Amino acid sequence: MNLPIEQYADLLAEKAKNLTALLAPFNPPELEVFESETSHFRMRAEFRVWHDTNEVGENELYHIMFDQETKQRYRVDQFPIANHLINKMMSSLLAEIKGNELLTRKLFQVDYLSTLSGEIAVSMLYHKKLNEEWQAEAAALKARLEHQGFKVQILGRATKQKIALDRDYVEEVLPVDGRNLIYRQVENSFTQPNAKMNIKMLEWARSCTRHSSGDLLELYCGNGNFSIALAENFRKVLATEISKSSVQSAQYNIEQNGIDNLQIIRMSAEEFTQAMNGVREFNRLKGIDLKAYDCNTIFVDPPRAGLDQDTLNMVQAYERILYISCNPHTLADNLQQLTQTHRIERAALFDQFPYTHHVESGVWLIRK
């Protein structure tokens, strides 16, 4: 698989041109553009596993992907989009499990999650129930990979079954504005795929909010990626997240980073809107006095569908809005309403996904 590295600058310029045109009706300042590394930038990858027989009758297996247009499978021995650690593990893993019936039989997928800190989780997915014999073989595999120098976690997954030999997460350390931030990242839950671009996003968000007063509300906080980085810019931070594993990771990350002004609530943005408007009461909010927060800044990083109408109405009530978007078209839709009351102070493009049409962007809005 070859990347069109020589075309990267032109591809990024085209994205910037398109985003600038999309935002033009809202009179933004000049777009800030943050470029990615041109290869080995992705921290996670997943591959199907193909089983074959070579010319001398030996069983072979290799990673495959599918062409998005033709749907034809193709073999992947190296994956230049993924970071060097994943590429190294791809070849080491297959070499170690080759010929091992317990580890390879009905293995259909392998997922990799890596970090800049040098840790990697390998999740092996099976169409069979995993037993103690599998665990023993997987433990031996883990030991062999560790002997090669890998800081590795091995996980096995099958229908209604998940086995973590040691733990089901890796720990990332991100240098943000001169400070190392620790993030627990759980296998099979959302993490930012381009870690170095994530650092640029965090630093940009911090620079937008540097001289803020009052408190911050964040919706969809995940493992605390943004709220932890932003906490020192505010008196207090209140954040919501619906995923149980993400909330647990966020609580751990808050503790590890010594953050004492950040509270996470497990509820959806829609539920929180109802609570703020007094429409419903929630047991999950017992012990949390929402009136004690003076949240005049809100941070949103919604799904591709953008903000729903009720949340959009709620967001509009805040003095300052920091909006990170993974879909510029729904961002533009939301801005039609938000710019009735707010102006765009800053706008940015973060090339989280080079060589694709996907665009990550951010806008910093201030009440008019």
Curated annotation (Swiss-Prot):
What the entry lists under Pfam families is as follows:
tRNA_U5-meth_tr
- Cite the binding residues for S-adenosyl-L-methionine: Q192, Y220, N225, E241, D301
Q: Name one GO cellular component term.
A: cytosol
Q: What class of enzyme is it?
A: transferase
The source's domain of life comes to Bacteria
Alphabetical UniProt keywords = Methyltransferase, S-adenosyl-L-methionine, Transferase, tRNA processing
Q: Which reaction does it catalyse?
A: uridine(54) in tRNA + S-adenosyl-L-methionine = 5-methyluridine(54) in tRNA + S-adenosyl-L-homocysteine + H(+); uridine(341) in tmRNA + S-adenosyl-L-methionine = 5-methyluridine(341) in tmRNA + S-adenosyl-L-homocysteine + H(+)
InterPro entries from the UniProt entry:
MeTrfase_TrmA_AS, MeTrfase_TrmA_CS, SAM-dependent_MTases_sf, TrmA_MeTrfase, U5_MeTrfase_fam
Catalytic residues?
Answer: C326 (nucleophile), E360 (proton acceptor)
The enzyme's E.C. designation: 2.1.1.-, 2.1.1.35
GO biological process assignments: tRNA methylation
Entry GO MF terms: rRNA binding; tRNA (uracil(54)-C5)-methyltransferase activity, S-adenosyl methionine-dependent; tRNA binding
Summarizing the function annotation, the protein's role is: Dual-specificity methyltransferase that catalyzes the formation of 5-methyluridine at position 54 (m5U54) in all tRNAs, and that of position 341 (m5U341) in tmRNA (transfer-mRNA).
For this protein, the record's PANTHER family field holds: TRNA/TMRNA (URACIL-C(5))-METHYLTRANSFERASE, TRNA_TMRNA (URACIL-C(5))-METHYLTRANSFERASE
- Similarity comment: Belongs to the class I-like SAM-binding methyltransferase superfamily. RNA M5U methyltransferase family. TrmA subfamily.
Give the protein name, as stated in the record. Answer: tRNA/tmRNA (uracil-C(5))-methyltransferase
Taxonomic source organism: Actinobacillus pleuropneumoniae serotype 3 (strain JL03)
Gene name of the record: trmA
